[in-house]
A protein has these predicted regions:
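N-terminal [4Fe-4S]-dependent radical SAM core
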Residues: 1-10, 239-252, 337, 341-344, ...
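Conserved alpha-helical substructure of the radical SAM core
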Residues: 1-112, 127-137, 334, 351-353, ...
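Short catalytic/ligand-binding loop motif for oxyanion handling, primarily in non-cytosolic enzymes
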Residues: 20, 31-33, 66-68, 95-96, ...
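Conserved strand-turn element in the central/C-terminal portion of the radical SAM core barrel
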Residues: 85-92, 129-131, 142-184
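Structural recognition of alpha->loop->beta junctions
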Residues: 99-118, 180-215
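C-terminal accessory region of radical SAM enzymes
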Residues: 145-158, 196-253, 272-273, 278-328
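Short, small/polar residue-rich loop motifs at catalytic or cofactor-binding pockets
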Residues: 258-261
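Short, acidic, Ser/Thr-enriched surface-loop or helix-capping motifs
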Residues: 267-268
Length: 361
């Protein structure tokens, strides 16, 4: 049994995706594409449940979970074990396979995050969607799923609709330079338009004044959640660097803190365990579930223990982590290193005490 409990485990049921988003490293991922076999998934879920290893299990890392051939069986398996399951989807199958809408509602999954990201036809171009899926079809499928879930009195699924915020931020090194939604005015305009669209006919819709006040609190360039109803929230997230993988010059971090292996871990579809959701290519393999238990990998074996011990001493020793936590200038690298300590050691604990559930994916 692990001597500590993770906040979340990212469980990648597949790394196959039907989108090729410009802001995602899918195009440069070198791993073989594939799906997790059911016996391996069952082993992972059994151990997580038996030892209460994580507060949240998320079908999330790379790939699109809703094109996993066994996705609804996988959801049922997780929920049958009493796991707090979250799922992140691009939402494309809500139009391509409309039966997915009601099937997902019927599962009773606690939370679904829809990576809308690009909220209009112009920005949808950067998603690399299948050619037969037009922007309005994509938006309509998502809209119908959200409305159906809101209208279903038997569903307690909470949906987060995620928007990509490309407002420049001093702590971030973008994966690529792009413009989707930038600044307070543009983001508030998009949030308002989508709130009106999703809540049309909803009995729990806030008053217009209340809705505008909630959206007016949005601050650009940071992660934020705006609750619309108990079952629906809008979420904004800044453009990320994916570990500075494509930056030509990076000043590596030498100190700082990351919650990889202490608060989170990932399980890739082939059973490889990685320290965090950003290790999309399995560059820091901690072990494999086919050979060892998750408890052994996280709490006994040297790779995870060494990484965690280093971060606990505010040391960044792994070269992949050094690059991820570094930046393209000395000043920004220093800001990011100091900021990582301030965020994880001060800001994050305070926010979790003030707002239970804060920081959940």
């Amino acid at each position: 049994m692990v001597s500590y409990r993770l906040e979340r485990i990212h469980l990648e049921v597949t790394n196959v995706c039907n989108f090729k988003c410009d802001f995602c490293p899918d195009a440069i991922m070198e791993r073989k594409r594939g799906h997790m076999d059911l016996p391996l998934l069952e082993k992972a879920l059994d151990e997580i449940a038996e030892h209460n290893l994580a507060k949240i299990v998320a079908f999330h890392l790379m790939g699109e979970p809703l094109i996993y051939p066994h996705i609804f069986k996988a959801i049922d398996m997780a929920l049958a074990r009493g796991l707090n399951l979250h799922l992140t989807t691009n939402g494309s199958t809500f139009h391509i396979r409309p039966e997915h809408r009601q099937k997902l509602i019927n599962t009773g999954i606690p939370k679904v995050t829809i990576s809308l990201q690009t909220p209009d036809p112009l920005t949808f171009i950067i998603r690399g969607a299948p050619p037969q899926l037009k922007p309005e079809q994509y938006f309509d499928g998502i809209t119908q799923y959200v409305r159906d879930n809101l209208a279903d009195p038997n569903s307690n699924t909470r949906i987060h609709l995620k928007f990509l915020d490309t407002t420049p931020h001093p702590f971030l090194v973008p994966h690529k330079q792009m413009h989707v939604v930038e600044g307070k005015a543009q983001m508030q305009q998009e949030l308002t338009a989508w709130a009106d669209r999703l809540l049309d006919g909803c009995s729990q819709r806030p008053s217009d004044d209340d809705l505008r006040q909630r959206i007016a609190r949005h601050k650009p360039g940071r992660w934020q959640v705006i609750e619309l109803t108990p079952k629906l929230a809008l979420e904004t997230f800044p453009l990320d660097s994916w570990g500075n993988v494509e930056s030509t010059e990076v000043i590596p971090a030498t100190f700082g803190y990351c919650n990889g292996t202490s608060d989170q871990a990932g399980i890739l579809y082939d059973g490889t365990v990685v320290p965090c959701c950003k290790d999309y290519d399995g560059q820091i393999p901690l072990g494999n579930l086919r050979d060892h238990t998750l408890c052994e990998i996280l709490d006994v074996q040297k790779p995870a223990c060494g990484l965690r011990q280093g971060f606990n001493q505010l040391k960044v020793t792994n070269p992949i982590c050094q690059r991820c936590m570094g930046a393209d200038t000395q000043q920004k690298a220093l800001l990011r290193q100091v900021g990582s300590v301030a965020y994880f050691k001060v800001y994050n604990p305070i926010m979790k005490r003030l707002q239970p559930g804060w920081g959940e994916i």
